[in-house]
Amino acid sequence: MQFVSTRPQPQQLGIQGLGLDSGSWSWAQALPPEEVCHQEPALRGEMAEGMPPMQAQEWDMDARRPMPFQFPPFPDRAPVFPDRMMREPQLPTAEISLWTVVAAIQAVERKVDAQASQLLNLEGRTGTAEKKLADCEKTAVEFGNHMESKWAVLGTLLQEYGLLQRRLENLENLLRNRNFWVLRLPPGSKGEAPKVPVTFVDIAVYFSEDEWKNLDEWQKELYNNLVKENYKTLMSLDAEGSVPKPDAPVQAEPREEPCVWEQRHPEEREIPMDPEAGAEPLVPAQDASSQVKREDTLCVRGQRGLEERAIPTESITDSPISAQDLLSRIKQEEHQCVWDQQDLADRDIPTDPNSESLISAHDILSWIKQEEQPYPWGPRDSMDGELGLDSGPSDSLLMVKNPPPAPPQPQPQPQPPQPQLQSQPQPQSLPPIAVAENPGGPPSRGLLDDGFQVLPGERGSGEAPPGGDRSTGGGGGDGGGGGGGAEAGTGAGGGCGSCCPGGLRRSLLLHGARSKPYSCPECGKSFGVRKSLIIHHRSHTKERPYECAECEKSFNCHSGLIRHQMTHRGERPYKCSECEKTYSRKEHLQNHQRLHTGERPFQCALCGKSFIRKQNLLKHQRIHTGERPYTCGECGKSFRYKESLKDHLRVHSGGPGPGAPRQLPPPPERD
């Protein structure tokens, strides 16, 4: 290997002139540092070719002899160039090690960052899992509380079921013994005595046999529909829970009942109680009447429709039936009642035989079957005697007493054949049950000569009819005086002349018009029954006597409280058979079922448009009549719908106007 150098000799550079010893100079020192760094790798590469490793590291000075210039020998000092060449290869190794350490440190830092991010992610997931676990625990606690409430309701239902079974057994035993009924008024929720007794007479309608024959077919159909409607509303009484405790007896007041269309002699006013015997023991008329007419409370009927019981209504006339048939019919009605034994002597029964009047068995059935709900009739002249509708934990009491035996009396004269009830054949016709009226003095409700009665609310002030100072027991022959009856009915102010001597109740059936004798003195709205007027009057007085024990929400009627309590218990007893939806009220289910059947029974007579609900028809009719019943109290502007008035009131109150979105009302078929 030969090196050709173009550099000047040390003598040319003036080494001696610089004062440098020639023995200490090397050619590598004469080069700039940067050239030495660049040429050293090349030199090392050339030296490594064809030489062993050890020989490449040692410099053989003899190998340089062919070179054009040679360094002068320096015997006293080792050459610098070979030593420098041996030390230089160690520097890249140190540099490579430093960069490796830095790269390793950076890799470790990146791994630490990745582990830190994963740790943060795990912490977040742990927090989410803890929240879900807390929600699950809360849900489990709520579910446990819900199950406890359901178990409590189930226990209450089982207890009530046991009570109903015992009442039914008592009823069957009493009916088997052929006892009779005395209805009683239920006490209040706190056990207080009721204020006013109530009878079935206020909603009953009576016809004689001849008048029934003179009625047209549509009038008879109207009568049947009224009876069915009353009976259907009666089925909902069991949900009222208006049943007092048996240990809370209530004294009843004597009430007057309507007389029948035939007046009989006192010796004929008895009814045989045992049709199997020829000479049967007879019951005094006043005893039977005292047990029938003191109807102070309600009997809770079983929830069965009129169609299922096949009770005929079109053939019900004033035909008398035996007490046994009457009791068997009552038993078929499956009335679930609680009986309370009370001494007959404690009831102040009138004993004057001259104060008796006759009433047919049909009238008794009418009183029993047409009772809708606890009607707060109160006194006839005012609303002060409002019926307390607060109900206790048990059902209505029905007082039962065996009629005491009476002294033998002559057999009643045979009656002409009369049509019988269709529910069961009548082997014989017996005289009507005798009922006593108020002894000594004119009756508080006028009785007409033809046997019809002016019902409460049809006379206005409740006074006796003109010339009506005669008693019901005497002075009237068989049939009475028709002219006097017409005069009394006209003078009462509730009838429509000689065609309707019975007053507004008779006019309802003869002319098909619904009478509403009870008017509100404040707003003038009329009602057909006194109870509706009393409940309506509470809207003016802001009276809400029925309060929920759970949420303290109050209501103005007892039925509203009962429906509200069903929401606490989660009761939805009415279920659609097609879509399985359930409802808490029967009318909501009926409206919903019309969606399946497509029935729209309420049709506008002017434009022919039909509706599912009656309320929608009434709202629609305001378009034709121009009625705007909702008036703003601030600006006097009137509106057709209540929702429009609410939107308008928001303008006065500073809330969102009519254009603002509002929450949609629930579907019509839901609660």
From Swiss-Prot:
It comes from the Eukaryota. GO terms for cellular component: nucleus. GO terms for biological process: negative regulation of DNA-templated transcription; regulation of DNA-templated transcription. One of its GO terms (molecular function) is sequence-specific double-stranded DNA binding. Its main location: nucleus. There is a cross-link at K293 (Glycyl lysine isopeptide (Lys-Gly) (interchain with G-Cter in SUMO2)). SUPFAM superfamilies: beta-beta-alpha zinc fingers, KRAB domain (Kruppel-associated box). Pfam families: KRAB (PF01352), zf-C2H2 (PF00096). Ubiquitous. The modification Phosphoserine is found at S319. It is found in: Nucleus. Residues 198-271 form the KRAB domain. Residues 470-486 have a biased composition (Gly residues). Residues 385-398 have a biased composition (Low complexity). Keywords: DNA-binding, Isopeptide bond, Metal-binding, Nucleus, Phosphoprotein, Repeat, Repressor, Transcription, Transcription regulation, Ubl conjugation, Zinc, Zinc-finger. A zinc finger (C2H2-type) spans 518-540, 546-568, 574-596, 602-624, 630-652. Residues 239-258, 373-486, 649-671 are annotated as: Disordered. Residues 402-419 have a biased composition (Pro residues). PROSITE patterns: KRAB, ZINC_FINGER_C2H2_1, ZINC_FINGER_C2H2_2. Belongs to the krueppel C2H2-type zinc-finger protein family. Binds to the U5 repressive element (U5RE) of the human T cell leukemia virus type I long terminal repeat. It recognizes the 5'-TCCACCCC-3' sequence as a core motif and exerts a strong repressive effect on HTLV-I LTR-mediated expression. This is Zinc finger protein 282. It comes from Homo sapiens (Human).
